[in-house]
Amino acid sequence: MKKDIHPEYVECTVTCACGNTFTSKSNKSEIRVDICSECHPFFTGSEKIVDSAGRVDKFKKKYNMK
């Protein structure tokens, strides 16, 4: 590898929206994620409802669509 051309590989803190944190390695010192293994439905066995219909309704209302 050539010297001084690669980004520094440091230990980083990964923070999930659910509040779970863990450490990993990355070029950044801090990473924020929306979902992790502690809150993902596949790992928890529970179902999580995503409110995508609300976004569509908001868009239609904003642009006066029917």
From Swiss-Prot:
The gene is rpmE. InterPro entries: Ribosomal_bL28/bL31-like_sf, Ribosomal_bL31, Ribosomal_bL31_A, Ribosomal_bL31_sf. The keyword Ribonucleoprotein applies. PROSITE patterns: RIBOSOMAL_L31. Belongs to the bacterial ribosomal protein bL31 family. Type A subfamily. GO terms for molecular function: metal ion binding; rRNA binding; structural constituent of ribosome. GO terms for biological process: translation. Pfam families: Ribosomal_L31. Binds the 23S rRNA. The keyword Disulfide bond does not apply. HAMAP family: Ribosomal_bL31_1. Binds 1 zinc ion per subunit. Keywords: Metal-binding, Ribonucleoprotein, Ribosomal protein, RNA-binding, rRNA-binding, Zinc. This is Large ribosomal subunit protein bL31. Zn(2+) binds at C16, C18, C36, C39. Its cofactor is Zn(2+).
